[in-house]
């Protein structure tokens, strides 16, 4: 029996794939658990429309991420923090601080998108990567200065 998968089945396929399985497996397991639908013409058209909607939505998100990457690439933000006697910061600059500074400049960036290996604890200029989509990154410069 041919069925259309509604969820990923390990070793069998992913959403929208049409696979052939034994009738008993389809009727007693896949279809009752809403893991698959019978591969009728109507069901195939329905799943294809869902897949095309998902593809359009993903393309729109990707385009928005590319536009943001163009605007964000090379942007410079300045963060001022109090400094101790030895030139080290009190506390550290974290992804939250960087995201807040970017949002104040009008860039809609979440702290989870900012990639730093460890919190910044010294004054200076740092280049930070921002992951906007699966494979779309932007580089920004973060200038850490002494708060007076």
Curated annotation (Swiss-Prot):
User: GO cellular component annotations, sorted alphabetically?
Assistant: ribonucleoprotein complex; ribosome
Physiological role = Binds to the 23S rRNA.
In the record, biological process GO terms are: translation
Give the UniProt family note: Belongs to the bacterial ribosomal protein bL9 family.
Highest lineage ranks of the organism?
Bacteria, Pseudomonadati, Aquificota, Aquificia, Aquificales
Gene3D superfamilies in the record: Ribosomal protein L9, C-terminal domain, Ribosomal protein L9, N-terminal domain
| Entry-linked HAMAP family | Ribosomal_bL9
Q: What is this protein called?
A: Large ribosomal subunit protein bL9
What InterPro entries has UniProt attached to this entry?
Ribosomal_bL9, Ribosomal_bL9/RNase_H1_N, Ribosomal_bL9_bac/chp, Ribosomal_bL9_C, Ribosomal_bL9_C_sf, Ribosomal_bL9_N, Ribosomal_bL9_N_sf
State the Gene Ontology terms under molecular function: rRNA binding; structural constituent of ribosome
Q: Which PROSITE patterns match?
A: RIBOSOMAL_L9
Keyword terms, alphabetized: Ribonucleoprotein, Ribosomal protein, RNA-binding, rRNA-binding
Q: Which organism is it from?
A: Hydrogenobaculum sp. (strain Y04AAS1)
């Amino acid at each position: 029996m041919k069925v259309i998968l509604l969820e990923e089945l390990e070793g069998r396929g992913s959403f929208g794939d049409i696979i052939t399985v034994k009738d008993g497996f389809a009727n007693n397991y896949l279809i009752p658990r809403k893991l698959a639908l019978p591969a009728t013409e109507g069901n195939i058209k329905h799943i294809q429309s869902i897949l095309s909607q998902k593809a359009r939505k993903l393309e729109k998100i990707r385009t928005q991420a590319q536009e943001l990457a163009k605007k964000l690439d090379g942007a410079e933000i300045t963060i001022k923090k109090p400094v101790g006697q030895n030139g080290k910061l009190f506390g550290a600059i974290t992804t939250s601080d960087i995201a807040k500074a970017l949002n104040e400049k009008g860039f809609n960036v979440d702290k989870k998108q900012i990639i730093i290996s460890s919190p910044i604890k010294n004054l200076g200029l740092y280049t930070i990567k921002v992951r906007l989509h699966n494979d779309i990154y932007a580089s920004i410069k973060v200038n850490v200065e002494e708060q007076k």
